[in-house]
């Protein structure tokens, strides 16, 4: 979730040396699943974000995405969230400040989304994305409750946090490149003015915690799903406590 474009690093999806047998089997199953169905959730999320931006323009927003009916009713802004407009915690993740902001975020999602969707499965991947977006909104409100914040990068940072956590558990979704991906984007987060640092950090933490639940409770999928949903509930509660 950001005021400007986030940094991009195309992860290397090639196999890394030194994997354990379990990650190799997981990778093979994931590739088989992808060949049958494809990462349609990732593609759908990209399509929704693009469609929402076009609707912003059609409802009076300027080319940089500001103004208009959809932007006014969807942007994350602490004082109106405090008045009960809690849906902004989620809707703001589908709004963007102009074509460049949208394009950069969607390009990152295009690069990193399919690998995680392969590993987690479509439903759990979508839950991870939503929970990460909510955690990003909470982080944004903690750091800057009176700022107007929009963008998918809180959710995208959650995907990066999930990849980093999985890599720490020797599950190499990005061929061992998750740490480099996160560090590269952290540099952009702190160097480029106007980026929502809280949104990025919140998403990163939320995604990592969600991935921890998914990987630790993989033999208990129902409990894992409930645990990740609880991360989303806590994120909403934390966000509302800041306004």
Residue ranges and their predicted role:
Residues 3-243:
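A detector for small-residue-rich transmembrane helices and their helix-helix packing motifs
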